[in-house]
């Protein structure tokens, strides 16, 4: 939770960026780590269609500075908007959302994707609450070419409408209807989303809301080695998918 403020800081320094976050089991290739990245703003379908989406929202909570949390009613999957101008307000509003999201017993944070960008002096963060890592159509590694399978594991960009398929065949066969079905499948259902909205209202209206602080969690430092040479050999200790093939063991 405490790292969310980095999104606001980045957008303050680089207002033309779009920043996105993939939580664990929400788009990263390995389910036990997360993505925090940025790219050019204004290219995602979520953003190109924003004039339509922003006209039909239901406000859940507004603070004294006019910063707010809203439901984006017309988006294909459940989505919440945090609209802020200050770093403090942004962090506090996200805290209300974070506290309201369901969290599995063995997880250390709720499943979610976040897409954030600037609109003038406003900071917009869209939070996509998740309940599944991958849709049922995602192929088993033992049968990657199974009929009807689609190698789509939605992350923040996919949830924002830019669905990326590693396989050309999946790209050609994917329809708008199937894409929406996939996004809804990995998102909270209507009942779960209604519960989140209710909890946000309850949390935001508690007298102690302003003092709620999530404990900081120290993130491990990961060092990745980079090697070069005319010939590189390494071994994989499990099965991995690369270029539509299952690979394992010694690689050259």
Predicted features along the sequence, with ranges:
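Conserved, single-site charged/polar hotspot
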Residues: 210-252
């Amino acid at each position: 939770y405490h790292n969310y403020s980095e999104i606001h800081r980045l957008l303050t320094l680089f207002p033309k960026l779009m920043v996105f976050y993939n939580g664990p089991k929400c788009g990263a290739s390995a389910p036990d780590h997360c993505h925090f990245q940025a790219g050019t703003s204004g290219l995602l379908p979520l953003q190109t269609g924003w004039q339509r989406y922003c006209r039909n929202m239901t406000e859940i909570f507004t603070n004294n500075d006019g910063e707010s949390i809203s439901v984006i009613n017309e988006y294909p999957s459940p989505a919440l908007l945090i609209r802020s101008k200050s770093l403090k307000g942004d962090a506090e509003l996200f805290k209300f959302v974070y506290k309201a999201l369901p969290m599995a017993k063995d997880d250390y944070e709720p499943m979610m994707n976040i897409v954030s960008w600037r609109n003038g002096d406003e900071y917009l963060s869209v939070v996509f609450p998740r309940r599944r890592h991958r849709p049922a159509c995602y192929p088993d590694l033992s049968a990657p070419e199974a009929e009807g399978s689609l190698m789509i594991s939605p992350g923040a960009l996919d949830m924002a409408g830019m669905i990326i398929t590693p396989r050309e065949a999946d790209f050609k066969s994917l329809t708008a209807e199937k894409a929406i079905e996939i996004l809804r499948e990995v998102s909270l259902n209507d009942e779960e989303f209604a519960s989140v909205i209710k909890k946000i209202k309850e949390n935001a209206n508690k007298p102690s809301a302003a003092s709620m602080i999530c404990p900081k969690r120290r993130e491990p430092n990961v060092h990745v080695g980079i090697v070069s040479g005319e010939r590189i050999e390494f071994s994989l200790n499990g099965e991995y998918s690369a270029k539509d093939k299952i690979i394992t063991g010694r690689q050259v």
